[in-house]
Swiss-Prot record:
One of its GO terms (cellular component) is cytosolic large ribosomal subunit. This is Large ribosomal subunit protein bL35. The keyword Ribosomal protein applies. Gene3D superfamilies: 4.10.410.60. One of its GO terms (biological process) is translation. InterPro entries: Ribosomal_bL35, Ribosomal_bL35-like, Ribosomal_bL35_CS, Ribosomal_bL35_sf. Belongs to the bacterial ribosomal protein bL35 family. The lineage of its organism: Bacteria, Bacillati, Cyanobacteriota, Cyanophyceae, Synechococcales. Keywords: Ribonucleoprotein, Ribosomal protein. GO terms for molecular function: structural constituent of ribosome.
Length: 65
């Protein structure tokens, strides 16, 4: 059987954890940050875990993660 291809766009956006879950960046932290509070911006810097309903699709896109 041939090797499975990795979707590079997904590989750049998601990272697998040691327990098999995936982490992702949060949205809304690129620009237009002036009106957002420091607390919100600090929260948006942190990584989030991909929801279990979406994890199966991410796993298919990154088969060797």
């Amino acid at each position: 059987m041939s090797k499975l291809k990795t979707r590079k766009s997904a590989a750049k956006r998601f990272k697998a954890t040691a327990t098999g879950k995936f982490t992702r960046r949060r949205a809304f932290h690129n620009h237009l940050l002036d009106h957002k509070s420091s607390k919100l911006k600090r929260h948006l810097k942190t990584k989030a875990v991909v929801d279990e309903r979406d994890a199966d699709n991410v796993k298919l896109m990154i088969p060797y993660a």
